[in-house]
Amino acid sequence: MKTAIVTGASGQDGAYLSQLLLDKGYKVYATYRRSSSVNLWRIDELNIRNHPNLHLFEFDLTDMSSCISLVTKAQPGEVYNLAAQSFVGVSFSQPVTTAEITAIGVLNLLEAIRIINPKIKFYQASTSEMFGKVQQIPQTEKTPFYPRSPYGVAKLYGHWITLNYRESYDIFGCSGILFNHESPLRGREFVTRKITDTVAKIALNKQSCLELGNLDAKRDWGFAKEYVEGMWRMLQEDQPDTYVLATNRTETVRDFVAMAFQAVNIPLEFNGKGENEIGVNTDTGDVLVRVNKEYYRPAEVDLLIGDYSKAKRILGWEPKTSLEELCKMMIEADIERNKLGFSF
């Protein structure tokens, strides 16, 4: 039986990847961060918590001895590092914590692999936020990086140290530069899920208005469940490499808001510009969307769009779910949750 470690298993990607690996017959050592309020709702929603081959562990990625202990205990063939302080906005208020987890944590895991068994295959979750102030459109594996947040900078360290260990110690280290990928399991601190959850509440008359920051920000959004398949495929190749996973389509936050309201049959029209822009229900005249400057970031990333042609050519991977389908899927899940009186 193949064995894998998945760090960050309580998150969106970690939960989907754990499910995928279990379905493929793996024994999975799934880790989550020590905290006062551990929440494994995603694991529960996918109905895998009691799977006989899933082993859940509290784990501190910032502690080197914990990394060595985990790798020694699990003796994995594959390690997927998805653990991170992964919210861009929080990284501005918690830059040191972000660096410790998202940057140095990668080094700790790679060192543990180098010491215990350099033949272990390693996947590092890199991000399109490393491109930041984009130098090329669309972005590929060869596009220069220009991160615009402490999160992007920390992820760039994790990316480069993975490549460094690949070249220095012959470790099978793959880096997946994943563009934004969403799902019903996305956290509400991320803009797409904030939108779908709030629009669901508006549709159910539980909330009156959605407040957002930069409506002009453009992102390449895909379906997270498809992206974890790409992660797995990277580690099945004969040679380690770096791959972009994306949809090669970009839409504004405003576009996603419009899709969300369309999914619940509420007619919406935007008026005004900048901080004065509003979204109005054309049937009732109610203001349903407002811009709040508090949600603007100190340094914005304006445009991300990825070219996944290398992943398609080598891995046979490509996105299948359209953004409209994804938005509808998320809205429907949030409506059901809010009808039941809860929303994670």
Curated annotation (Swiss-Prot):
GO terms for molecular function: GDP-mannose 4,6-dehydratase activity; NADP+ binding. Its EC number is 4.2.1.47. One of its GO terms (biological process) is O antigen biosynthetic process. Pathway: Bacterial outer membrane biogenesis; LPS O-antigen biosynthesis; Nucleotide-sugar biosynthesis; GDP-L-fucose biosynthesis via de novo pathway; GDP-L-fucose from GDP-alpha-D-mannose: step 1/2. Its cofactor is NADP(+). NADP(+) binds at residues 8-13, 60-61, 82-86, 155, 181, 186. InterPro entries: GDP_Man_deHydtase (IPR006368), NAD(P)-bd_dom (IPR016040), NAD(P)-bd_dom_sf (IPR036291). SUPFAM superfamilies: NAD(P)-binding Rossmann-fold domains. The active site is at T127, E129, Y151. It is an enzyme of class 4 (lyase). Keywords: Lipopolysaccharide biosynthesis, Lyase, NADP. It catalyses: GDP-alpha-D-mannose = GDP-4-dehydro-alpha-D-rhamnose + H2O. It comes from the Bacteria. Catalyzes the conversion of GDP-D-mannose to GDP-4-dehydro-6-deoxy-D-mannose. Belongs to the NAD(P)-dependent epimerase/dehydratase family. GDP-mannose 4,6-dehydratase subfamily. HAMAP family: GDP_Man_dehydratase. This is GDP-mannose 4,6-dehydratase. It comes from Aggregatibacter actinomycetemcomitans. The lineage of its organism: Bacteria, Pseudomonadati, Pseudomonadota, Gammaproteobacteria, Pasteurellales.
